[in-house]
From Swiss-Prot:
Name of the protein this chain belongs to: Tumor necrosis factor ligand superfamily member 6
Organism of provenance: Mus musculus (Mouse)
Impact reported for residue 218 to G: In strain: BALB/c, DBA/1 and DBA/2; enhances cytotoxicity
Entry GO CC: caveola; cell surface; cytoplasmic vesicle lumen; external side of plasma membrane; extracellular exosome; lysosomal lumen; nucleus; perinuclear region of cytoplasm
Transmembrane segments: 79-100
Similarity annotation: Belongs to the tumor necrosis factor family.
Lineage: Eukaryota, Metazoa, Chordata, Craniata, Vertebrata
Disease: A deficiency in this protein is the cause of generalized lymphoproliferation disease phenotype (gld). Gld mice present lymphadenopathy and autoantibody production. The phenotype is recessively inherited.
Length: 279
């Protein structure tokens, strides 16, 4: 039998003694060259490698671990659908009730408005029946007067302008330079006179408001101002005198303004005036 020649030493041959060979005598054995005697320069061959263990037969595939059975879902998880449905149903019912309440309130409000309007109409009609309307009475005009300076005034007491410019009169009368009271009450009376001159001679300046009534034997002075040394001698000068106070006047009282120097008065309507108004 043939053996591979590259197999490592030593090799073992089985020799059959009964076999004959044309190239060797029977019983002869050809030892391995390494088994013969070594010379002094020859080295011993390395030991043979350890025998290789035979490969195990192909193993069977490992069995798969048994599948763990899935846990059954909790029975409570199946209740979420009915719960959600119930919540939606409750919300819809609440919305419906709210809309019904709103509609009902609007209806009641409309009925209340209609009832109120009818009540007002009935009340107004009853008042008209109980108190029939009478022609509206004209309210008495408020007692007020404002008279301005009259440059044509040449006598005492002073005469005034009661028609033109800023002059006005209502609720009282103007008669011969005086204001006649028609209604008893409290009045604020005022008067302003503007004096001026080209040269100063220091003559006394008198300005007064007085009242005249048939009940009194003499005139009653209400307000008065008297000025001295109001200018420098020989120079142009000007002086303004103002009087004003509240008085309790009665019907038929006459009010006048008197001054001492008629020729020294500036009769411009913004500088000299006389008036009153009822409080």
């Amino acid at each position: 039998m043939q053996q591979p020649m590259n197999y490592p030493c030593p090799q073992i041959f089985w020799v059959d003694s009964s076999a004959t060979s044309s190239w060797a005598p029977p019983g002869s054995v050809f030892p391995c060259p390494s088994c013969g005697p070594r010379g002094p320069d020859q080295r011993r061959p390395p030991p043979p490698p350890p025998p290789v263990s035979p490969l195990p037969p192909p193993s069977q595939p490992l069995p798969l671990p048994p599948l763990t059975p899935l846990k059954k879902k909790d029975h409570n998880t199946n209740l979420w659908l009915p719960v959600v449905f119930f919540m939606v149903l409750v919300a819809l019912v609440g919305m419906g009730l709210g809309m019904y309440q709103l509609f009902h309130l609007q209806k009641e409000l409309a009925e209340l408005r209609e009832f109120t309007n009818q009540s007002l109409k009935v009340s107004s009609f009853e008042k008209q029946i109980a108190n029939p309307s009478t022609p509206s009475e004209k309210k008495e005009p408020r007692s007020v007067a404002h008279l301005t300076g009259n440059p044509h005034s040449r006598s005492i007491p002073l005469e005034w302008e009661d028609t033109y410019g800023t002059a006005l009169i209502s609720g009282v009368k103007y008669k011969k330079g005086g204001l006649v009271i028609n209604e008893t009450g409290l009045y604020f009376v005022y008067s302003k006179v503007y004096f001026r001159g080209q040269s100063c001679n220091n003559q006394p300046l008198n300005h007064k408001v007085y009242m005249r009534n048939s009940k009194y034997p003499e005139d009653l002075v209400l307000m008065e101002e008297k000025r001295l040394n109001y200018c420098t001698t020989g120079q142009i000068w000007a002086h303004s005198s103002y009087l004003g106070a509240v008085f309790n006047l009665t019907s038929a009282d006459h009010l006048y303004v008197n001054i001492s120097q008629l020729s020294l008065i500036n009769f411009e309507e913004s500088k000299t005036f006389f008036g009153l108004y009822k409080l």
